[in-house]
């Protein structure tokens, strides 16, 4: 099995033993809020991991470094999985950090936060018509690999800019964002503010293997569940 070549580096603050505990308290400050989040996640197909967490790098087999090159946050034209499926991916990330509690080992720590960040970035691009040209092959997909300074975390097209836009920009729909999406934005913002300055130069989508093991991704069912939450 090949290790992922470009893991995200959580900042040094994550070395504190109570990092995930404090993070959970900031996002879900009361037991009732945490219980509600757990119920919402379970309704959308998330289950607490038993033993090895399914979002840990060791759970994914890589035949070569660029195996999942085009399955990530900027898929090719006509291959976008749909916003409902992306929200499910984001909810899996929320469940991972709040309930699976990755063990803190080593310094610096390596965790694949690209899952959550890429999901937010994809949702942002998906709902903004002004970014439609970025989906075309030859633009963002190809240039991303040859212009890392522009498409890296701190570049003008990087995740930092997109995530900030998602957090501070106007919501384009008449109804407010779902509770789940607000939780995800909050936890991602907290990670940024608490030391994730080294986060993700690359945004390879590493949950492709995860989705192959969980094929139940009906857009209609997901939409119904999201409307009920």
Swiss-Prot record:
GO terms for biological process: symbiont-mediated suppression of host NF-kappaB cascade. Keywords: Host cytoplasm, Host-virus interaction, Inhibition of host NF-kappa-B by virus. The keyword Repeat does not apply. It comes from the Viruses. GO terms for cellular component: host cell cytoplasm. The keyword Protein transport does not apply. It is found in: Host cytoplasm. Interacts with host RELA (via RHD domain), ELOB, ELOC and CUL5; these interactions induce the proteasomal degradation of host RELA. Inhibits host NF-kappa-B activation stimulated by IL-1 and multiple PRR viral detection pathways. Targets host NF-kappa-B component RELA/p65 for ubiquitin-dependent proteasomal degradation. This is Protein MC132. It comes from Molluscum contagiosum virus subtype 1 (MOCV).
């Amino acid at each position: 099995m090949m290790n992922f070549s470009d893991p995200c580096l959580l900042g040094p603050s994550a070395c504190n033993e109570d990092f995930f505990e404090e993070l959970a308290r900031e996002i879900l400050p009361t037991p009732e809020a945490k219980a509600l989040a757990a119920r919402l996640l379970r309704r959308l197909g998330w289950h607490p991991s038993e033993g090895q967490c399914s979002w840990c790098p060791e759970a994914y087999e890589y035949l070569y470094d660029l195996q999942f090159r085009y399955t990530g946050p900027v898929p090719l034209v006509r291959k976008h999985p749909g916003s409902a499926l992306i929200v499910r991916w984001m909810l899996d990330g929320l469940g991972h950090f709040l309930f699976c509690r990755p063990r803190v080992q080593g310094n610096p720590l390596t965790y694949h936060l690209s899952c959550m960040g890429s999901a937010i970035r994809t949702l942002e691009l998906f709902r903004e018509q002004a970014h439609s040209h970025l989906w075309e092959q030859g633009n963002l997909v190809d240039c991303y690999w040859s212009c890392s300074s522009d498409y890296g975390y701190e570049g003008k097209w990087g995740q930092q800019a997109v995530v900030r836009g998602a957090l501070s920009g106007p919501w384009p729909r008449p109804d407010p964002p779902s509770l789940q999406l607000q939780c995800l934005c909050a936890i991602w913002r907290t990670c940024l503010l608490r030391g994730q300055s080294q986060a993700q130069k690359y945004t390879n989508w590493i949950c492709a293997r995860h989705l192959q093991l969980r094929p139940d991704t009906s857009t209609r069912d997901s939409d119904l569940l999201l409307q009920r939450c």
